[in-house]
Amino acid sequence: MRRAINLINRNPRPYDIAADQSSLLFSSLPYDVVLNCLARVSRRYYPNLSCVSKSFQSLVRSPELAHMRSLIGKDDPVVYVCFSDTKPFLGRRLDWFTLNPNEKKTSVLNSFQVFSYYMLYCPSVSIGSKIYFVGGCMYKCLPGLLIFDSWSGELCVGPSMKEARMLPGVAVVNGKLYVMGGCREDQIQVEVFDPNSQTWEVGPLSSDGEVRYGKGLMRYGAIVTEAVALEGKVYCMSYKDGSHIIYDTKDGKCETFLMADGKAWRRGGVCVVNSVIYVYYINLGVMWYDPKDKVWREVKGLNKLDYKSIDMVGMVDCNGKLGFLWGNNTREIISGRTEKRIWCEMIVLERSGVEIHGTVEWSDLVGFVPHDYEIWRCLGVSY
């Protein structure tokens, strides 16, 4: 046990690790006792524990440990931030970093090269500890599904969709993935993936409503840059002006809605916190959508960031608070490498009538990344 404590305190001594037999004693304890002990250790130390032995590595990646953490209330969500470099498509890669909002520190997750560079810009969503990559990116239709288990670190290929899709809208409703558009109008417009049965089925699509998905405004299927779910409906934000739609998962009816500036939505921070949709505009700040009046309203009490000093931002739900991340454009030489800072604010949101006020609970520097990296996606992952 002392050997594990040495590692946790970041003070391992090679000769102690080589000679100390305490790990054998620890391993000889009943399996449930070992799991209970490890479950009470912060996940930030698991990479160190994995280096102790193969048995430790197996334990910290086991689903039983994840379940034990959940039982004792240690399954706090962790934010996974995806960064993309700005190299040409063929040379690009995804790099993931983790942020524990309680510890305000980042740690590098083992980065992985995607199987196909076309998967780089495909939509991604999270359910529990797993991250799902769906379809293809711009100019490339793919039916593929990749599943990354953030607990075990494994990336595997899931069942393919019935249709190949380019930048479909993807959101999670009642534990299922709803995938919309990104294909021709004569193809299946909506597919639903059930993670439990690992099967795809055709989603409902009604001819009633303001617009039919895949017809009219959506003739060639939406090329969606962001999608979020709220109260059984999927809100799809498109690259095309006037093509932002709301899809009802119950009956397949669709209606259009406008973004805050009435234009196409390129990319930026979007998330749902406490059943409210939030977006970030450089020139408008943090906005929220009022579905009753069908209008966007500004979140009061927050200062706008200087658009000249930031690049792409990320937003994520952190236990009912709004996690807001951004990188600055200032380059710094750190340990001989050119890097830039990544900042995070934790915002408490309070609603009063038709107004929502935001209060910054804390704001801090949380890490550094190479200067050519951009925030591409923020996902809340639970264990």
UniProtKB/Swiss-Prot annotation:
PANTHER family for this protein: F-BOX/KELCH-REPEAT PROTEIN SKIP4, GALACTOSE OXIDASE_KELCH REPEAT SUPERFAMILY PROTEIN
Superkingdom per UniProt: Eukaryota
Keywords carried by this UniProt record: Kelch repeat, Repeat
Species of provenance: Arabidopsis thaliana (Mouse-ear cress)
UniProt key word Glycosyltransferase: no
Repeat (Kelch) residue spans along the chain: 130-175, 176-220, 269-317
Protein name, per record: F-box/kelch-repeat protein At2g22030
Record field: transmembrane: none
Biological classification of the source: Eukaryota, Viridiplantae, Streptophyta, Embryophyta, Tracheophyta
Segments forming a coiled coil: none
Record-linked SUPFAM superfamilies: F-box domain, Kelch motif
Domain F-box: 23-71
